């Protein structure tokens, strides 16, 4: 099993190109199931999760051609995918595929909308709390689907097709909004999605669906209106830049000191995180090429943050911020409101010498002067990169184990950090 070795202490200086957003690329790939024409997606990151979803879509009979990889390119490099779901041969998504990635459950929506039947295994992915699919099922039932759960599978059908409906989510749900949005595009009549997630990735998917002929209004607001159409056609769409990757590298620079240009980043996608970084002592400059992040000389200021749905501080940057705050001059407080059990990185950060106390949903971080390298183990995608951030600033050597979590969500991480002066290498086996 691969590991990453990091020797801390070096500042980061240079340029890091920001990849396409994983959290947009996955639902965009799934949306290709809605049409029998080809969907072309540019700026798709080369990630383990993307490769896994390609296998899942292939199981349904989807043809995917990857272009844009030249001889000598790294395995994980942005790509263009030509996705054709002209001939869907199977409407079952089996356990052995879906169990490896939670987002793959979303195939239930386009399969049901277009084929009127779907059988999808209950999902897998990061082990963060329960993350139930109840709200997704509720949305599909509102649209007229008949759903049962049998032997670990969700079995859904709508012989006459889906019908427009009023869907009101009891709480904001990104997954539920994606599923409702995709299903409603081919439903007969108009669908209203209330308490919808406002994340930029939702907007990106809606923009792509509209290019394919959907009639969606209000994406990015709490109320989305979808007027169903009979058919979607092919289109070409560029995946938006990854705001979580942007925030992660920005926090790494704030942690180590230095000056890095995050090329291609869009500040409006993570303004709340940039505001927190400014409060923590980083200098953020927006320019024509993206965002420049610097911290030279000054220490790290403590902050108090509560995670919230967009435009609030993203839960997917909570672990990275906690790593940064381990070196702050004072006590910081981070409250997690989105997912339960999302503090699994705390015990691993403690191995560096971090001082963190948990009280329910709130972590109090007592900043320390120095962190020391240690062998650590990744527990999930975002937690794993928080260990990398801590290791970059720690004295001595750190070995990060179980890095398959990193490969699920960060494209060419070692290369990007190494190019900016970090001592970091992947050790195979």
From Swiss-Prot:
EC number assigned by the record: 2.5.1.7
General function of this protein: Cell wall formation. Adds enolpyruvyl to UDP-N-acetylglucosamine.
Residues binding phosphoenolpyruvate: 22-23
Subcellular location: Cytoplasm
2-(S-cysteinyl)pyruvic acid O-phosphothioketal modifications at: 126
Catalytic reactions on record: phosphoenolpyruvate + UDP-N-acetyl-alpha-D-glucosamine = UDP-N-acetyl-3-O-(1-carboxyvinyl)-alpha-D-glucosamine + phosphate
Stored Pfam families: EPSP_synthase
Gene: murA
GO CC entries: cytoplasm
A GO BP annotation: peptidoglycan biosynthetic process
Protein name: UDP-N-acetylglucosamine 1-carboxyvinyltransferase
InterPro entries given in the database record: Enolpyruvate_Tfrase_dom, Enolpyruvate_Tfrase_sf, MurA_subfamily, RNA3'P_cycl/enolpyr_Trfase_a/b, UDP_GlcNAc_COvinyl_MurA
């Amino acid at each position: 099993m691969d590991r990453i070795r990091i020797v801390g202490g070096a500042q980061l200086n240079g340029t890091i190109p920001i990849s396409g957003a994983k959290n947009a690329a996955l639902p965009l790939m799934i949306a290709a199931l809605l049409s029998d024409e080809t969907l072309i997606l540019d700026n798709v990151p080369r990630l383990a999760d993307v490769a896994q979803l390609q296998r899942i879509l292939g199981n349904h009979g989807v043809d995917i051609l990857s272009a844009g990889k030249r001889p000598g390119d790294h395995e994980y490099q942005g790509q263009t995918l030509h996705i054709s779901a002209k001939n869907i041969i199977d409407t079952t998504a089996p356990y052995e595929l879906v169990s490896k990635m939670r987002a793959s459950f979303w195939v239930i929506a386009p399969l049901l909308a277009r084929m009127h039947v779907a059988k999808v295994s209950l999902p897998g992915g990061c082990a963060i709390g329960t993350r139930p699919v109840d709200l997704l099922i509720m949305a599909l039932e509102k649209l007229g689907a008949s759903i049962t759960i049998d032997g670990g599978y969700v079995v859904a059908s709508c012989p006459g097709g889906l019908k427009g409906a009023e869907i009101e989510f009891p709480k904001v749900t990104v997954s539920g909004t994606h599923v409702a949005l995709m299903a409603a595009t081919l439903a007969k009549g108009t669908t209203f999605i209330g308490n919808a997630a406002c994340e930029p990735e939702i907007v990106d998917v809606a923009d792509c669906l509209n290019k394919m002929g959907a009639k969606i209004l209000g994406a990015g607001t709490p109320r989305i209106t979808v007027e169903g159409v009979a058919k979607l056609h092919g289109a070409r769409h560029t995946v938006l830049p990854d705001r979580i990757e942007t925030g992660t590298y920005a926090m790494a620079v704030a942690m180590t000191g230095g000056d890095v240009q995050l090329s291609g980043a869009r500040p409006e996608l993570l303004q709340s995180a940039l505001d927190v970084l400014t409060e923590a002592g980083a200098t953020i400059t927006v320019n024509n090429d993206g965002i420049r992040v610097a911290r030279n000389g000054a220490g790290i200021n403590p902050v108090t943050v509560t995670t919230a749905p967009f435009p609030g501080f993203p839960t997917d940057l909570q672990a990275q911020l906690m790593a940064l705050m381990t070196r702050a001059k004072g006590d910081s407080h981070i409250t997690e409101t989105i997912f339960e059990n999302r503090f699994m990185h705390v015990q691993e950060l403690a191995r560096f010498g971090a001082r963190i106390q948990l009280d329910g949903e709130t972590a109090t971080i007592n900043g320390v002067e120095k962190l020391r390298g240690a062998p650590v183990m990744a527990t999930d995608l975002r937690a794993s990169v928080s260990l990398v951030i801590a290791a970059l600033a720690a004295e001595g050597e750190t070995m990060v184990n179980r890095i398959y979590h990193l490969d699920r969500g960060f494209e060419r991480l070692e290369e990007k950090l190494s190019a900016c002066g970090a001592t970091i290498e992947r050790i195979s086996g």
